[in-house]
Amino acid sequence: MHLILFIIFLISLPFAAEGEILRLNRDEFIETALKNEPRFQETRMAVLAKEGRVEQIKAGALLPKFELSMLTGVVPGLRKETDYYGQEVKAWDFTKMGPYFGMNIQAAQPLNFGQLQLGLRAARADLQQKKMEIEGKEQFLKVHLLSYYYGYLLAKEMNKLAQDGHKQMRKAADNLEEALDDGDEDASQMDLLELKAGFFEIDKAVLEAKSGLKKAQLAAKFALSLPDEVSFQPADSVLAAVADFVPDLDSLKNWAYMHHPDIRRLTAGLEATSMQMELASARMAPEFFIMGEFEYAKSWAGDRTSLSKNAFAQDPVNKLSGAFGVGIKYRLNFWNQWENYKLARIEHRILRQTESYANRGIELQIEEKYEDFLVAKSKLESARNALRATEGMLKGAAMQYDLNPSKTSGLLASAYKKNLLMKKDYYFAVYEYNMAVARLFAQAGY
């Protein structure tokens, strides 16, 4: 029984030591990494603060001042006395303390609804400006994260190529050694030495591929904020060219004019500064408001005559009063509002100046990235055609090797080496093409 438990324990050790693997496709990787980006967490909190500012302005449009105050305690009573002139007066009676209750209600409603609307529109434009700022940063952060994802797939392909190359070179060397041992006259010792000399490059490639794969794994874990016991694996098994449709240059420009985050942020900023100018100008005018107040106080102290029994009787303690009217407030320090107006006007002019060249600058950047995309696309097509050619050469060399292994081993090794190097160049071309598409889309805000 103890032996069986020991065997089960030994079998379960590899499974217990194996960490958890997180498999994500490209879009899931980007989404998860963006959620775990600490800098964007802070920026999103700033967006929430601006959303709260909008709600605060909306809530303050109706009865911004609506206060209720209440007080309860103990006060002295009142008694009637005759003064020096023989008149009856009321005096405090501290021998008869009693409970006291008082309340005061104040309410005010501004009538300058135009200013409230301007403030609300300015706050909404400021919120939109912040959202577009985040969206623009996310576009370029996605490019950085895509380099992690595609770089991981590229490292996997390089590792597979290096391992396969090492395996095939070892197999060719073993076959050549067998031919030499069998006394095959067509087998050459120089060919064997040449093969063995090439092992240094293969071993170097294997080590570099393993190191690159490890670095790519660490970069992906850092982007995803994964703990040490969790590793990342891309859902894609091979590095392939993205199938995303790439519009023509004019379509990308037209899209950018309408949807580019920087342009939309600039538009929102212009609207915000325009509203701030109007708001500063409006605040130099008087503000009208409606105000009301109600006050009630009652004491149950002193004598129990009709005055104290009447809930609305008024005396030095008991009160019942109210007021309602229309008021006006005028800011006499108009120079302060004038400075606010000038500041908003300067900021608005700066954004207007930026607008004059922003569209052209974005257009030129899109043209530059589109040219990079066309170059990467041409290189990928060229690499794909060259890869097909080396695969044909490899098949031909393999057929000749099957007919006469001893005489064609060098030809097979040369063809395999060319095919291996071409595969490496092809996968790098795929990586550059995918990144060129990502940079183009980010630049156009697509």
Per-segment meaning from a language model:
Residues 1-32, 69, 82-87, 207-255, ...:
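Terminal intrinsically disordered/low-complexity segments used for targeting and assembly
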Residues 21-22, 67-108, 237-245, 278, ...:
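Small/polar, glycine/serine/threonine/aspartate-rich low-complexity segments that form flexible
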Residues 71-77, 114, 171, 295-299, ...:
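Structural signature of outer-membrane beta-barrel domains
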